[in-house]
A protein has these predicted regions:
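Histidine-centered nuclease catalytic patch
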Residues: 479-509, 522-525
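C-terminal accessory regions
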Residues: 39, 307-452
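Inter-Walker segment of RecA-like/P-loop motor cores
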Residues: 50-107
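Loop/turn-to-beta-strand initiation segments
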Residues: 108-110, 133-137, 441-442
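Short, charged surface segments at domain edges that flank catalytic/cofactor-binding sites
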Residues: 449-479, 501, 505, 527-533
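Walker B catalytic acidic pair
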Residues: 114-115, 140-142
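Conserved helicase motor core of P-loop NTPases
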Residues: 3, 8-36, 40, 133, ...
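The −1 position to Zn-ligating cysteines in a subset of zinc-ribbon hairpins
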Residues: 405, 474, 489, 510
Length: 535
C-alpha cells in the first residue's frame, strides 16, 4: 500500500531526524487507523531498530504486525524487559519493583516505542534518563486513556495523558483516517467527535443526529431489533464499568444460545474465549485480551504442592487451547477460590502468622530480618501461583481500558455507562470505545441505569441475571440452586450503610432466607453503629 501525502510528509520529517546529529523524542501522533506504525516501518530500517511496547499485549500485536508485513529480522521487547524489571512482594505483601539500566553498547541507535499513551510514570522516568543517548520514535494517540496514576497528568485541554507526551522534542500528527471508510457516517462521527472532545455536549443528541440505520445504530436495551442483531452478528460490547460488561456478557451469550439460564463463566469445548488478565505458568505466557479456542477440558485435576514448609492439595481444570498462531497449549484454570486458591492461601497465611509472632517476640535485628525475608518469599510465591491460573471470558464484552489496541467490526456501546464529573474524562473513554469499531457502532441506552454510590436501586432483569449467572445461579451463602429469578435477591456484600457500592465486586445473589438473615444482622450492626456515634 502506497503512502498518502500526509504520510510522505511524516516520512521526510523522520528521515531528517534520523540523519541528524540530535537525539531525543520524536512523536508520531494521531488517532487509531491513521497508519502511524505503517509509516514508521516504511521509513526506517526495521532490522537496525529496537521496538518496545508499554505492555505485553502491545508487543504481541507489534510482532504480528511486523511478521504479516514481511519483516522477519526484528527485535521487540516490553519496556519492563528493556529495563530489567523484577517484581516481588515484601513482608507486608506490598509489590516491590527493581530495575537496572540497559547496556547501551548493545542497543541500536533507533528505538521505536508503540502505544506510548500506556507508558506509566515509572517507565517515563527511566526513559528520560537515556533520552539524550538514543533517537526515540514514539508512536501514540494522546487522546487514548493513560495508566492510572496517583496524580494524573493533564494536557492544556484538560485530558489525562502519559507524561511522555509533555516531553516531545519533535512531533508530527497524522489526521487522515484509514480504519473506517472515509465516505461513511461512522468515519464522520468519530472524526468530528475527536475534533470536539474538549467540549461538553449531550451524547444522546449526538447519537440521534448521526444515527442512520446503517453503520450507526441506536437502540433501547429492550429493543427486539437489538436482540436480532446480537443473534445474527458477532458484536462486542465496550463498556466503562465491570458490571455493565458482565451484564452484556450475559445478554449477548443468553441471546446467542437462546438460554436465559446462560452461565457467563461456563467453559465448553469449541468456545472462543479471551484472557481477562496476565497468565504465566512455566514458559507459557498469555496476555490480557489474547484470544484462544478451547479444544479439550479436563474439569477435575488434583495436585499437591509444597509452599514454604507446608503441603497444599487443590483441584483445577486443565484446558487445551489453540492460540491465534495455531499452536496448541495446556493452561490451568481454577475451580473457584474455595477449591483452588484457598487451600494454598490458608497454608501461606498460617505460616506468615507464625513468622509474625516470632518477629514480635524477638529482639534480634538480624533474626527479624531473616524472618521478614521468609514472609516476603511466601508472598511472592503465592503471587506467582495465582498468575498461573487463567481467568477466561467469552469475547462478548470488554472494558474501554482493556480494549485499547484492539479493533472490532461491530461495537456495542452502552452509552449510559459513560459519565464522569470531568467531561474530558468521559469523552476520552467514549472516544476509545468508538474508535475500536471498523464497521459499525450500535449505541444502546437504558433509562434504568444507576450510579456506583446510589443509595437505592432496583436492578434490571438483565443485571439480576448477569450477577446470578456469574455465581452459576447459586446462593452465595448456602449454595442452593436458584433456578427462578423470583427466588433471587441481589445483595450488597458490604452494605450501603457501611459505604458499600453498586459494583460487581460488592454484589452477590442470595436466596430469600439467607438474604433475610443477613438483613437482620445488618440492621443490628447499623443500630450499634448509630448508637456508638451518639455517645
Amino acid at each position: 500500500m502506497a503512502l498518502n501525502n500526509e504520510q510522505i510528509e511524516l516520512q521526510n520529517k523522520i528521515n531528517d531526524f534520523v540523519n541528524s546529529d540530535k537525539n531525543g523524542f520524536f512523536g508520531v501522533l494521531g488517532g487509531g487507523g491513521t497508519g502511524k506504525t505503517f509509516t514508521v516501518c516504511q521509513t526506517i530500517n526495521v532490522e537496525d531498530a529496537l521496538f518496545l511496547g508499554a505492555t505485553n499485549k502491545i508487543c504481541s500485536v507489534l510482532k504480528k504486525y511486523l511478521t504479516n508485513n514481511g519483516y522477519f529480522k526484528f527485535e521487540v521487547k516490553t519496556i519492563d524487559s528493556f529495563f530489567g524489571f523484577k517484581i516481588k512482594k515484601d513482608h507486608n505483601n506490598v509489590t516491590v519493583i527493581t530495575h537496572k539500566k540497559p547496556n547501551l553498547s548493545k542497543v541500536p541507535k533507533i528505538i521505536v516505542i508503540d502505544e506510548i499513551s500506556l507508558i506509566n510514570d515509572r517507565s517515563f522516568d527511566l526513559l528520560m534518563e537515556i533520552k539524550d543517548k538514543r533517537k526515540f520514535i514514539l508512536i501514540g494517540d494522546n487522546l487514548q486513556i493513560p495508566p492510572i496514576e496517583a496524580t494524573p497528568t493533564r494536557d492544556k485541554n484538560g485530558f489525562k495523558v502519559s507524561k511522555i507526551f509533555t516531553q516531545l522534542d519533535y512531533s508530527f500528527e497524522l489526521k487522515i483516517q484509514n480504519r473506517q471508510k472515509i465516505e461513511s457516517k461512522l468515519f464522520e462521527l468519530i472524526s468530528k467527535f475527536r475534533q470536539n472532545m474538549d467540549k461538553s455536549f449531550s451524547y444522546i443528541q449526538m447519537i440521534e443526529k448521526y444515527s442512520n440505520g446503517n453503520d450507526i445504530l441506536y437502540y433501547d436495551i429492550n429493543d427486539k431489533e437489538l436482540k436480532n442483531l446480537i443473534y445474527n452478528k458477532n458484536p462486542i460490547a465496550v463498556g466503562y464499568k465491570n458490571l455493565t460488561c458482565l451484564s452484556f456478557n450475559w445478554l449477548i451469550g443468553s441471546t446467542k444460545f437462546n438460554d436465559k439460564g446462560y452461565k457467563v463463566n461456563s467453559l465448553n469445548v469449541g468456545d472462543t474465549v479471551f484472557f481477562d488478565g496476565f497468565y504465566k505458568r512455566d514458559k507459557d505466557v498469555f496476555y490480557t485480551s489474547e484470544i484462544v479456542n478451547i479444544l479439550e477440558i479436563d474439569n477435575f485435576c488434583e495436585e499437591t504442592i509444597k509452599i514454604g514448609n507446608e503441603f497444599a492439595t487443590y483441584n483445577f481444570k486443565k484446558i487445551k487451547v489453540k492460540n491465534e498462531n495455531g499452536i496448541d497449549k495446556i493452561i490451568f484454570v481454577g475451580n473457584g477460590y474455595k477449591n483452588t486458591l484457598y487451600p494454598i492461601s490458608y497454608r501461606v497465611t498460617k505460616q506468615i502468622d507464625k513468622l509474625k509472632k516470632q518477629i514480635d517476640n524477638s529482639s534480634n535485628v538480624k533474626y527479624k530480618w531473616i524472618l521478614k525475608n521468609k514472609i516476603a518469599e511466601l508472598n511472592t510465591e503465592y503471587s506467582n501461583i495465582k498468575t498461573g491460573f487463567a481467568t477466561l471470558k467469552k469475547p462478548y464484552a470488554i472494558t474501554a481500558h482493556k480494549s485499547q489496541g484492539s479493533t472490532f467490526e461491530d461495537v456495542i456501546i452502552p452509552i449510559y455507562d459513560y459519565a464522569a464529573k470531568v467531561s474530558q474524562d468521559s469523552n476520552q473513554l467514549l472516544y476509545v470505545a468508538m474508535s475500536r469499531a471498523s464497521g459499525r457502532i450500535i449505541f444502546v441506552n437504558n433509562k434504568s441505569n444507576f450510579k456506583d454510590n446510589s443509595n437505592r436501586y432496583s436492578f434490571t432483569q438483565m443485571e439480576r441475571n448477569s450477577i446470578a449467572s456469574y455465581y452459576d445461579y447459586k446462593c452465595n451463602v448456602c449454595q442452593i440452586d436458584l433456578e427462578d429469578l423470583r427466588d433471587i435477591d441481589i445483595d450488597h456484600i458490604i452494605p450501603l450503610a457501611f459505604n458499600g457500592t453498586n459494583n460487581i465486586a460488592n454484589l452477590q445473589p442470595l436466596c430469600k432466607n439467607c438474604h433475610k438473615e443477613k438483613t437482620k444482622s445488618e440492621k443490628h450492626n447499623t443500630k450499634t453503629k448509630n448508637y456508638a456515634t451518639t455517645i
